């Protein structure tokens, strides 16, 4: 690997392979994704794989569903990524992965699950406001808890964050305010397709909602 340039939609890798220099646009976010892709590429090359075919496949790689998955590019040109991060460490990692790719503002939308570790809520709020430019606290899976109390726990560690309980409205707000050089992160639910509220599982897919809000 000669160089790596982060972009809003992935990263451009400059590679030296068998003495020749190649550039490939890897449509994945994060330095760790580049490292993983290059390890896999090395295995293919060691097995006698064709360089041109290998580079073509690298340029078409897709992330695991709900793991820094690019759901849409907004009308303003800002990409929106959906990730399963639902712990302080997970949220910190997702934001850190996106930060080098962000020329403008990094807008983070997230919440915390009900009937789970309450101590992580203010910590997640603190992580979000420390590492994002705009933070929107919303509902995740409140389960049997009062959603407003969960948000209050998060907000205790997130001074300056916006609070929008309805997750769809929170996503729409983020998309509406995203400018061309911004990146939006919708964290917490990833590939989940339901929202658990008072014992009921209501249909809710972050990726689909993002696309509907951006349409």
Each PLM stretch: what is its role?
Residues 14-18:
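A generic structural motif
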Residues 35:
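Short nucleic-acid-contacting surface segments enriched for D/E, G, S/T with interspersed K/R
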Residues 5-12:
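A short, compositionally biased
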Residues 32:
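A short beta-loop-beta micro-motif enriched in histidine and acidic residues
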Residues 9, 19, 27-29, 38-215:
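ATP-dependent carboxylate-amine ligase
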